[in-house]
Amino acid sequence: MELVFLGTGAGLPSKTRNVSAVALNMTQEINEVWLFDCGEATQHQILHTNLKPRKITKIFITHLHGDHIYGLPGFLSSRSFQSGENQPLCIYGPIGIKEFVESTLRLSQTNLTYPITIKEITEDGNLFETNEMMVETKKLQHGIDSYGYRIKEKDKPGELLVDKLKQIGIAPGPIYQQIKENEITTLDNGSIIYRNDVLGPAKKGKVISILGDTRYSIDHIPFIKFSDILVHESTFTQDKELLAFEYNHSTNVQAAKLAKEANINKLYLTHVSSRYQAEDIDSIIEEARKIFPSTWLANDFSVYEI
């Protein structure tokens, strides 16, 4: 599992940062890629990575500002020609995302070659759940409806205790897989094996919290608490805290403070204003690390293993 940052700029593209988009690559786990926001030219950014558009099965839009959605029509259209035929895709987002997508496709006379589902978010809580994953959402504090997403990978069974099985006379073979897949297994001799008796500790699933544009708020702490990864906007540096509040954004230090208060493992800053140039990057990171040492500032095409 890895995070691939496709766009890390705020508001408008710059020479070094495109507008917002980040992919959660889970091809090794569930053979899917999930995309969070889709700013203008996201499909161009994808071309510079190993991500396959047909593997993108879900797109989560945090809010409807243009730097987070203007890349959707182009990506959806191109996916039809990139082995995406008949590969379903679901889009989640605030009220209005359905009208935006359907209107742009209709007016441009774009006919997709795959089924698309659009689900609008109307309340906080559980968005959906599968056998492997669970996604929750929470409204944040921005000028328009903006949401955060908490992605929870479910715990996986521990490793089969092979030595223990051998000790009780069960030789390696297909029976091992049967034991691992079933709570109770009856052997040919009538013996009963309980899976929990021959498995090691469960492998704890990862938790990734990705927040859309927002002001700093302690109300977000319960939603993101104990996440392995927090992706948080860092539009301004701390000397611009009042400006951040006025424009419904956050500073690098505020993001670090939130990560510390919520017992996050790693913080990745993104959504950086174009006012900050290459020579400012070190100070942005240093300011945040004084509060929360496990902080990184994402760049376009940064890839982080989870």
From Swiss-Prot:
The lineage of its organism: Bacteria, Bacillati, Bacillota, Bacilli, Bacillales. Keywords: Endonuclease, Hydrolase, Metal-binding, Nuclease, tRNA processing, Zinc. Zn(2+) 1 binds at H63, H65, H142, D213. It comes from Oceanobacillus iheyensis (strain DSM 14371 / CIP 107618 / JCM 11309 / KCTC 3954 / HTE831). Binds 2 Zn(2+) ions. CDD domains: RNaseZ_ZiPD-like_MBL-fold. This is Ribonuclease Z. It comes from the Bacteria. Belongs to the RNase Z family. Its cofactor is Zn(2+). Zinc phosphodiesterase, which displays some tRNA 3'-processing endonuclease activity. Probably involved in tRNA maturation, by removing a 3'-trailer from precursor tRNA. Its EC number is 3.1.26.11. Zn(2+) 2 binds at D67, H68, D213, H271. SUPFAM superfamilies: Metallo-hydrolase/oxidoreductase (SSF56281). It catalyses: Endonucleolytic cleavage of RNA, removing extra 3' nucleotides from tRNA precursor, generating 3' termini of tRNAs. A 3'-hydroxy group is left at the tRNA terminus and a 5'-phosphoryl group is left at the trailer molecule.
